[in-house]
Amino acid sequence: LAVLEKMRHIERLKQPSVIMLTAFGQEDVTKKAVDLGASYFILKPFDMENLPSHIRQVSGKANTMIKRPLPSFRSATTVDGKPKNLDASITSIIHEIGVPAHIKGYMYLREAISMVYNDIELLGSITKVLYPDIAKKYNTTASRVERAIR
């Protein structure tokens, strides 16, 4: 937070995009970081494989690994029918329904949506499987996950 405060006072034409990675999931800390200019907030532990897509999302740049543009007749899905940028779609939907990114349940909700997208059967066992799986990933309890999402 101290770095964000100092960056805020540096006179530049444009403030850089900041991705904040932290183990602290307290709502007040997250809100302060967002207020100070953090563009994206990642709570530890997180999936390292998703970091490049988060960076591209924050920077507003497309995937540089794609060498040629996709033809316009192709849809935005892969061969197995899943969106190419699931995380961006989830973020967009969550923002559309008005869930602020600084609340603790935001990361749990993102994870839950992603897990259900990959395995629709989880909808039949939300409290028995989904919440405990999310709790394991974030090193917390299923009841805390449920409370934060609600």
Curated annotation (Swiss-Prot):
Binds 1 Ca(2+) ion per subunit. The keyword Aminoacyl-tRNA synthetase does not apply. GO terms for biological process: detection of stimulus; phosphorelay signal transduction system; regulation of sporulation resulting in formation of a cellular spore; sporulation resulting in formation of a cellular spore. Residues 132-150 bind DNA. Keywords: Activator, Calcium, Cytoplasm, DNA-binding, Phosphoprotein, Repressor, Sporulation, Transcription, Transcription regulation, Two-component regulatory system. Its cofactor is Ca(2+). It is found in: Cytoplasm. It comes from the Bacteria. Residues 1-59 form the Response regulatory domain. Its main location: cytoplasm. This is Stage 0 sporulation protein A. It comes from Bacillus cereus. The lineage of its organism: Bacteria, Bacillati, Bacillota, Bacilli, Bacillales.
